[in-house]
Amino acid sequence: MAGVSGCIKYSMFTFNFLFWLCGILILALAIWVRVSNDSQEIFSSEDVGSSSYVAVDILIAVGAIIMILGFLGCCGAIKESPCMLLLFFIGLLLILLLQVTAGILGAVFKSGSDRIVNETLYENTKLLSATGESEQQFQEGIIALQKEFKCCGLVNGAADWGNNFQKYPELCDCLDKQRPCQSYNGKEVYKEPCIPFIKDFLAKNLIIVIGIAFGLAVIEILGLVFSMVLYCQIGNK
């Protein structure tokens, strides 16, 4: 009977070790986003926070699953365990199918997701002029975004801040004279609202996510091939 190829065996181990490290990285980043002060400020409102943290929680689950699969693949390759390799193959196949399904649904419902983003941002404009403690955390997050994107407000510029415009020093101050500025309540502020910049930022990051997902899909297909070849070789020993 044919033996187990050392090349396939250690290629499988190396692949799964890298896969395991990717799981740790995803899990660590997702947990950091979940507990970091910056993200809590931006997603502090109930409407934004609930939907945003669902996505982060999904990433935490994905990272944990990838870690488990990487462990199964490493141990299955080194110990030449058909059971572990089969569990790895099934788990990886399910993840790949879920990725493909998510990609198809994302493409089909892209216009709907754009509408939800618009509605969420427009709905939360009123939080800029509110005075509650939870709203204040959201406002501080938007102030950070304003400094980053050199914009003011979400929809109507400085007017979105209402009476809170005087509350925050240096709010919307137009420090970059190459950007459009306007006079508001006696000082120069950025004219452009932040929604276009936020949407552009999300769109650019979506492209990055799609690229990462495509790269992961290629790696997962290689993992499926390696695991099945090794599984068959172990069975034929």
Swiss-Prot record:
Glycosylation sites: N118
Protein name: Tetraspanin-8
Binding partners and assembly: Forms homooligomers. Interacts with MEP1B. Interacts with integrin alpha3/ITGA3. Interacts with RICTOR and MTOR. Interacts with ADAM17. Interacts with ECE1.
Subcellular location, record wording: Cell membrane
Membrane topology: Multi-pass membrane protein
Transmembrane segments annotated in the record for this chain: 10-33, 58-72, 84-109, 206-230
Pfam families for this protein: Tetraspanin (PF00335)
Organism: Pongo abelii (Sumatran orangutan)
Keywords of this entry: Cell membrane, Glycoprotein, Membrane, Transmembrane, Transmembrane helix
GO cellular component terms listed in the entry, alphabetical order: plasma membrane
Family: Belongs to the tetraspanin (TM4SF) family.
InterPro entries given in the database record: Tetraspanin/Peripherin, Tetraspanin_animals, Tetraspanin_CS, Tetraspanin_EC2_sf
Xref: PANTHER family: TETRASPANIN, TETRASPANIN-8
Gene: TSPAN8
Superkingdom to which the source organism belongs: Eukaryota
Task of the protein: Structural component of specialized membrane microdomains known as tetraspanin-enriched microdomains (TERMs), which act as platforms for receptor clustering and signaling. Participates thereby in diverse biological functions such as cell signal transduction, migration and protein trafficking. Promotes ADAM17-mediated TNF-alpha processing through recruitment of ADAM17 to tetraspanin-enriched micro-domains (TEMs). Forms a complex with RICTOR and integrin alpha3/ITGA3 to mediate mTORC2 activation and AKT1 phosphorylation leading to cell migration.
Cytoplasmic topological segments: 1-9, 73-83, 231-237
Extracellular side: 34-57, 110-205
